[in-house]
Amino acid sequence: SLLQFEMMIMEVAKRSGIFWYSA
C-alpha cells in the first residue's frame, strides 16, 4: 500500500541520513 511505501522511504532516509522525504 502507499503507507507501506512511505514508511520504507522514511527508513531509507534515516539510514542514509537524508531527509528529502516530506509528507
Swiss-Prot record:
* Origin species: Crotalus horridus
Indicate the enzyme's highest-level EC class: hydrolase
Keywords associated with the record: Blood coagulation cascade inhibiting toxin, Calcium, Disulfide bond, Hemostasis impairing toxin, Hydrolase, Lipid degradation, Lipid metabolism, Metal-binding, Platelet aggregation inhibiting toxin, Secreted, Toxin
UniProt cofactor(s): Ca(2+)
The Gene Ontology terms for molecular function here are:
metal ion binding; phospholipase A2 activity; toxin activity
Family (UniProt): Belongs to the phospholipase A2 family. Group II subfamily. D49 sub-subfamily.
Q: In which tissues is it expressed?
A: Expressed by the venom gland.
One GO term describing the cellular component: extracellular region
Location of the protein in the cell: Secreted
What biological function has been recorded for the protein in this entry?
Answer: Snake venom phospholipase A2 (PLA2) that shows high lipolytic (1200 umol/mg/min) and weak ADP-induced platelet aggregation activities. Also shows weak anticoagulant activity (IC(50) of about 1.0 uM). PLA2 catalyzes the calcium-dependent hydrolysis of the 2-acyl groups in 3-sn-phosphoglycerides.
The protein's name in its UniProt record: Acidic phospholipase A2 CHA-E6b
Modification note: Contains 7 disulfide bonds.
Does Disulfide bond count among this protein's keywords? yes
Co-factor: note: Binds 1 Ca(2+) ion.
Q: What is its EC number?
A: 3.1.1.4
Reaction catalysed?
a 1,2-diacyl-sn-glycero-3-phosphocholine + H2O = a 1-acyl-sn-glycero-3-phosphocholine + a fatty acid + H(+)
**What are the GO BP annotations of this UniProt entry?**
lipid catabolic process
- Miscellaneous note of the record: The subspecies C.h.atricaudatus mentioned in PubMed:20347857 is currently considered invalid. However, since different origins of specimens explain sequence variations, the specimen origins are indicated under strain in the reference section (in PubMed:20347857, South Carolina to C.h.atricaudatus).
